[in-house]
């Protein structure tokens, strides 16, 4: 499990007690409704959440990190109407922000009389309201959808639903505090979002959404800024120190770690407000959604919960003996949205043909003064087991007070959200190990195989699982190790997107999703390997320490092609292996797209050397041809590409060597690209006797030889005049500092040319370029020609280690004085971009830029 927090009595769920908060020990009346966990799970020990204790029984749905989990279906039902906090489902997009009660602020802006920042103490001084409320992810039961056809979301079982007592200030009271303007004055929507930079997309990387001002001000709707759950201040996984609570709506609208409120005349423009939590028509796929504007259509936004119900007893893989008739109590839950009351739950024993069995509804909640019901009901139905003997499918459905009920048939949608089809149990007559006749129950799509090793009937029906293979005794196929889990090639090929990207290395499969934001080469470096065997490319560019680091992302073995894998040995329990049988005809090759760019992030492309031009004694221009004379390279400004070559090393073994390069040719150049490369020869520099490995490989090429090229990669993109993206977060820029060392000039030169060749781009540039000697300065005539033709916008300053007499620029290591003379100081709209040897960046660039107001990784960006 891990190590108990050293000061657990002063902490709750890894956070310090809020001033005045009682310790959560067994003397505390809230202890049973929290069932607190004080130990760090081993699975969290090496990630950013290594301070948050979590219940070990929660089922992790997206690997170790980020933490997305649900309790086992039957377990959460046994807890009763109120869910212990430690067993509450969790939906996190990334690491949990480590926020503090005393320092956290909520910024309130927009159409209010008194824009301000308010503290948590300010909120706690407002009248406190406690609302019992069900939260559920709108992806609840999504695994059933994914078994029909993969959606864009990961699989939830039926356990993404929990009830807590939430305490906080009414949003209406907070809005009155700041003097919210009236609808007549234009105030129509209240926007709310979490911390900036939490997520990869959108203008500021925040998760945000909105509701109407009328809804926010309506006291009957119980909209809160919540800071307590089940009597104690919030668990970090659930939004500490505060979150939105919108009862009767999907959980995705109750934004956690609330940081900003904004009153507007328009609906939220947050990226996630448009691209998440929608139920698009079933014919809409990812391509048509993007091209035809479906994401921006407000008709499909999912706000209120729809009606839903499930069966928890009988459970998955549960058996009932058929030797005699007994009484058995069926159980489950039901809920609806918008405050609507559940009025009945029905059970059918013939697949939904007749509904003659109304269940007993167990109502624990007291509705609010407006008659709103914000939680769930549990239901029970005592039956004779003889009713199971003749049944093949048992179905439940719920009805609410508006006479809504559940659809009989599941509808596939792109995001897989809002699945509320009737919950169906399949029944199987079997003989147990003792030779007794029994009924085995099979739920549609549980997250984990049952105690007998069986998967859900939707998995089985899809033809992707072995129907009845007890995990303890299922024999592995030849070539498989029964103690390990496996991923088939077909499964691997499905994980190529940012939401879930896997790759194989030396026969093992790794989940790179959680490392996308932290990879030094940017997310593209991992995404281009997604769904593939990346062994050659990985070995070509990574050190032994990087290979060691890879171990924490291991998930399974790569199954040998053509070997069937039993369900109990598959990672996730789903066998999506595709076996190509002998004699199967190959699919016809697609026609060549003459307008397609040369670069392909998923495929190595051969480029032939057309010319070698010596620029100086140790600098060469290499011109490589594309597939045809009119073809564009397809490299966005600011990005680079990987070039590799298979060579025979000194030991006589074949190896792949690969490096990242930026061409000096403009994006609009057709038919070829140029690389200007400094050749680091062996036995020239005493500190580097072997010289530059790849530059010497390039120098040895003859005209007509080829290299392999793949890309683009990189986290920086100069998108259009005055705009750039850093890790896909778009920002405006007016002034760019560039610091380059040696061959690190080439990406700077690429960006400079793109800016200065566009008459509408007025961005100013300062370049500080460091080299060993004046003779080492690459592209000096071209640089100074750019500066001469744009004297008001381009300034260039050099520094060299060994200056010659009469040298008019700087000498030595880059220092603060040099930076202040050559570069812009930080102000909004100014960034610094860097490319050069790591020691230069670490010890010279970043420390001095920080003193000038730049923030590493945000406004001081390494290429």
UniProtKB/Swiss-Prot annotation:
PROSITE patterns: CYTOCHROME_B5_1 (PS00191), CYTOCHROME_B5_2 (PS50255), FAD_FR (PS51384), MOLYBDOPTERIN_EUK (PS00559). The keyword Isomerase does not apply. Residues 602-719 form the FAD-binding FR-type domain. It is an enzyme of class 1 (oxidoreductase). Heme binds at residues 519, 542. Nitrate reductase is a key enzyme involved in the first step of nitrate assimilation in plants, fungi and bacteria. Induction: By nitrate. Repressed by ammonium, the repression is not removed by the addition of extra nitrate. Urea weakens the effect of nitrate, but does not repress expression itself, implying it possibly reduces nitrate uptake rather than nitrate reduction. Up-regulated by nitrite. This is Nitrate reductase [NADH]. Mo-molybdopterin binds at residue 137. Residues 484-559 form the Cytochrome b5 heme-binding domain. Binds 1 FAD (per monomer/chain). Binds 1 Mo-molybdopterin (Mo-MPT) cofactor per subunit. FAD binds at residues 659-662, 676-680, 688, 693-695, 746. It comes from the Eukaryota. It holds the Pfam family FAD_binding_6. Its cofactor is FAD; Mo-molybdopterin; heme. Its EC number is 1.7.1.1. GO terms for molecular function: FAD binding; heme binding; molybdenum ion binding; molybdopterin cofactor binding; nitrate reductase (NADH) activity; nitrate reductase activity; sulfite oxidase activity. It comes from Ulva prolifera. Homodimer. Keywords: FAD, Flavoprotein, Heme, Iron, Metal-binding, Molybdenum, Nitrate assimilation, Oxidoreductase. One of its GO terms (biological process) is nitrate metabolic process.
